[in-house]
Amino acid sequence: SGPWMCYPGYAFKVPALPGCRPVLLLQCNGSQVPEAVLRDCCQQ
């Protein structure tokens, strides 16, 4: 749960920078991405 939930064809709820999208897509594809990495990436 939380802001990083994934949906088909929609990788994230929050606005993400272009550089952040691949990281979120990795998580949506089943990879374990630390939440801190996502926060650091998306809040730049």
Curated annotation (Swiss-Prot):
Asked if Secreted is a keyword of the record, the answer is: yes
Q: How is it modified after translation?
A: The disulfide bonds are essential for the inhibitor activity.
For this protein, the record's PROSITE patterns field holds: CEREAL_TRYP_AMYL_INH (PS00426)
Q: Which UniProt keywords apply?
A: Alpha-amylase inhibitor, Disulfide bond, Secreted
Q: What does the record say about tissue specificity?
A: Endosperm.
Question: What's the stated role of this polypeptide?
Answer: Alpha-amylase inhibitor.
Return the protein name: Alpha-amylase inhibitor WDAI-3
Species annotation: Triticum aestivum
